């Protein structure tokens, strides 16, 4: 007996016909498609290596002399020379007015330059809580300045006991005894607590606080990492590694810090250093940064006595050679 053709059977039959039709078309398309040789895939060009961006700090033109060198001129010079950005030293700013900060931001934008970091000073190595609070407030104020200028990072210090004179002997060993009645471990705790307060504001503002090996307590790399690591889970915590601020052989210490680096300040000393003189092997520095897969800014701090008009271009030429 022949079964009647039900709607379900008709639907199944139609589905089979469509499936067979689609399968046949797919087969034809597969036959018509070009054959790709496996060797052709492997021969595809590798992506071009990304060039590390180079900035110049306004500090390169002004080493705390009485008369400030205008930041506007640094921005214009940086654009002419071919830098990618300008790091602003807070103490070099004429004032903190909104019109002045907007002027710097617009000038950098018009010249195709970024402003990657605002370098500020503070010390949390102070026994009195009220003194540390003042520097926390100063840091938070500077976070707001960075936001106004569109700057994504702030250079941070730990501070120091200030129990020894900053002379040639100090820069050789970096040793500084604690104030009587206190220890370096006390200072480390003060730094962690103070940074924690600052990070609350930094996270809200979207500004990175980049702790630097900037003498004082941070001359000891173990201490620096002891402060950094408990705070590193914060999205606003970073590290600024300065090539010229190491005691003794810089390269093993630089290698320890390179994996944590958010930004790097690279010093040159043409004409002899203002405070001390180092002969840094920048090819070795570049190799360490490549090994650490560093991709951030390298900011020139020309700290030599030679005229910046000649020393800054020399430094840029050196950096282009080793970091490109």
Give each language-model segment a name.
Residues 2-34, 39-55, 62-81, 218-324:
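Histidine-acidic metal/acid-base catalytic patches
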Residues 24-33, 107-114, 125-238:
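Active-site acidic/histidine proton-transfer and metal-coordination neighborhood
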Residues 44-46, 75, 100-110, 140-152, ...:
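Short amphipathic alpha-helices and their capping/turn segments at secondary-structure boundaries
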Residues 46-61, 117-123, 168-175:
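N-terminal small/glycine-rich loop or linker at the start of catalytic domains
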Residues 56, 78, 86, 108, ...:
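Conserved, mostly hydrophobic/aromatic
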Residues 56-60, 88-92, 117-122, 156-158, ...:
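A cross-domain feature marking catalytic cores of carbohydrate-active enzymes
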Residues 70-73, 100-103, 132-139, 192, ...:
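Charged helix-capping and loop-helix junction motifs
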Residues 87-105, 161, 165:
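Glycine-rich, proline-tolerant flexible connector loops at the mouths of alpha/beta enzymes
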């Amino acid at each position: 007996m022949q079964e009647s053709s039900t709607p379900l059977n008709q639907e199944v039959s139609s589905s089979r016909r469509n499936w067979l039709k689609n399968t046949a078309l797919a087969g034809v398309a597969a036959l018509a498609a070009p054959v790709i040789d496996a060797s052709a895939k492997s021969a595809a060009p590798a992506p071009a290596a990304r060039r590390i961006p180079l900035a110049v700090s306004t500090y390169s033109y002004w080493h705390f002399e009485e008369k400030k060198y205008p930041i506007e001129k640094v921005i214009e010079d940086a654009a002419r020379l071919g830098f990618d950005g300008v790091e602003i030293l807070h103490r070099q700013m004429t004032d903190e007015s909104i019109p002045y900060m907007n002027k710097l931001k617009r000038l950098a934008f018009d010249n195709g330059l970024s402003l990657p970091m605002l370098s500020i000073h503070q010390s949390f190595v102070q026994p009195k809580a009220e003194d540390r609070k003042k520097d926390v407030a100063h840091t938070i104020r500077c976070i707001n300045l960075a936001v106004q200028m569109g700057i994504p990072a702030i250079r941070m210090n730990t501070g120091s006991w200030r129990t020894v004179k900053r002379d040639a002997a100090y820069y050789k060993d970096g040793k500084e005894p604690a104030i009587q009645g206190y220890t370096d471990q006390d200072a480390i705790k003060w730094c962690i607590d103070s940074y924690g307060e600052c990070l609350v504001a930094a996270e809200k503002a979207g500004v990175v606080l980049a702790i630097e090996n900037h003498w004082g307590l941070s001359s000891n790399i173990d201490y620096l990492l002891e402060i950094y690591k408990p705070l590193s889970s914060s999205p606003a915590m970073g590290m600024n590694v300065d090539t010229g601020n190491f005691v003794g052989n810089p390269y093993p210490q630089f290698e320890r810090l390179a994996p944590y680096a958010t930004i790097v300040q690279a010093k040159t000393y043409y004409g002899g250093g203002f405070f001390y003189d180092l002969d840094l092997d920048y090819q070795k520095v570049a190799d360490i940064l490549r090994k650490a897969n560093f991709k951030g800014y390298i900011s020139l701090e020309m700290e030599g006595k030679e005229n910046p008009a000649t020393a800054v271009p020399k430094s840029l030429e050196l950096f282009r050679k080793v970091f490109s």
